[in-house]
Amino acid sequence: MTTLPKQPFGRDASLDGQEVELDFAREWVEFYDPENPEHLIKTDMTWLLSHWTCVFGTPACQGTVAGRPDDGCCSHGAFLSDADDRANLDDSVKKLTDADWQFREKGLGRKGYLEKDELDGEKQWRTRKYKGACIFLNRPGFAGGIGCALHSKALKLDVEPLTMKPEVCWQLPIRRTQAWVDRPDGSQILKTTITEYDRRGWGEGGADLHWYCTGDPAAHIGKKQVWQSYGPELTELLGEKAYAELATMCKRRQGLGLIAVHPATVAAGPH
């Protein structure tokens, strides 16, 4: 049997072996949206029943850019998906004070908190990079604490962070794709797929990330499974009734026993 070499993913050699391979067995469940019989939802049970959790602010988070562990996955700024996403961000910014946002003066200054960058061959808005990372990222030493100013403010206001952050930020590391599918009888349905936003989700640049959390056992230490810890986000992506159906499916699958357990969750040990 031929043994294929492990792909380095652009990491330092000292980090090799820490992340599991990208390709492994997954279990999927499909169900129809209770509110729309022409909407099929395909869900990755291997990911949703994993114990991944965000480890930002701990030694386990090594950052996607070498030498910048305190950035987490915020080094590159966030592309805005559409006009609504930008309007929501603008509203969120109005709620931030100097005590919330380390770079508020810069963000509200002449250069602003957004800049144009290329995505898929087009110029699109993204949050501005300032001193090597997203301008909304509070750095070590800031009295208000490190991390996303928008996320922290949402917690202070006792609202879900997804209500204040750009879409790409609160969805990560959930990946939702949608496509119209032709059925054999000529009818069409909308198919939504929910899965892990792994390195490949970042496109060609994903292979060059210094480190990425979803494949590292050190990030699979959550007390709750992803379908539970990301309940608000999944509800926003699918709708309340569809999420309730998904939750029922996850509970049932967990009770029966998952065959294709996420290898990073396995490597992390008992939960």
Model-derived features: positions:
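Short loop/turn segments that flank or connect secondary-structure elements
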Residues: 1-271
